[in-house]
């Protein structure tokens, strides 16, 4: 820093970033003259912490997207090349075709999730309507019942009607992503409990499971884009790594509070507390 000040005294304009007490500043130091005489130096410091964090997140997101897009594409290309070159036995053909179809579906899902997140980031205004969380929970449970039965996991819905004023598709995304994870990371013979309630001006959606749980030190990161608690299981479990990030952003879009409680080896409970609809379109 002192060297840069001396350089400014010598007539050189100095611009650099400086980190101090957990904040980041853009500093500009320049020589000030009065006539032909040196009057001093001018030092300007701008707090650019938020911009720096945004840029860091953008770079990380771009790197992660590139990796997540490349992985299924490589698998698709590999299978296609083997088939094209006649290196696949007729009896093995269904396996390779299934691989191409599976990885293609994964790629499409990733792109759709990225588009959803982009729309939420941009704050695009989406038409809202009355949505009953109990109906959403019931529909979600029915859609996931096949996956749950395949893993020997029971899915139950209980509670009472709780209406919110919001975007039905986004609220469905919240419920579906939470419940899908609860099934996906559960244990054989486990259970998923979806609860809906209305109290104290809040419409509550609670998803509780008896799954593998999340270590305490990782709980604050599970809603980050592409973050996976257990990377060794990510390929087997599928998914894009964006589901919980969509939950976080969709909840924020509805001014809903998101809380997570988890004990490794015992399970996880996620609660989304929406403003309860009172008949007014301002109830958000």
Regions found by a protein language model. Name each.
Residues 147-157:
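Short conserved segments within the C-terminal catalytic ATPase subdomain
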Residues 84-91:
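Short acidic helix/loop segment immediately C-terminal to the autophosphorylated histidine
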